[in-house]
């Protein structure tokens, strides 16, 4: 089929290509702007969140805030706000460890405090052990003797042996 206006068709195709490219760039800019705003917006607890839900953020070097006392059954939501990955785990008072998995930047993880929880729970990053938070659960119903019994017990000799192992491993030469 022969067209009567070949110059007009090629101009129309060029215009369509430019409009499509422009639309693609606008969509890409909007997508990047929404991602940037979401990752830097402050994380606030909304009024619709139940009272038994706590939110924390994980930055490059710390958990924040840690100014609440969770109760059994509470849910703790942790959002990775840093630009690096973390791998969070929780150590229970009896020494049990629960791995919450790897958190890439911008992701969120949830942990529910066990229904029978009492004592100190430690949140820590496998990759960056200096990043940790201690949460005292059910503090009102925790007697000091019950808390002390939850701590690991070591004999004097075990402590001395442990100290000796640490000191001797530091002094070893490769």
UniProtKB/Swiss-Prot annotation:
Database matches in CDD domains:
MauL (cd04221)
Which pathway is it part of? One-carbon metabolism; methylamine degradation
Per its UniProt entry, which superkingdom is the organism in? Bacteria
Gene3D superfamilies with a match to the protein in the record: Cupredoxins - blue copper proteins
Output the InterPro entries linked to this UniProt entry.
Cupredoxin, MauL
Describe the function of this protein: Probably involved in TTQ prosthetic group biosynthesis.
Q: What is this protein identified as?
A: Methylamine utilization protein MauL
User: Which gene specifies this protein's sequence?
Assistant: mauL
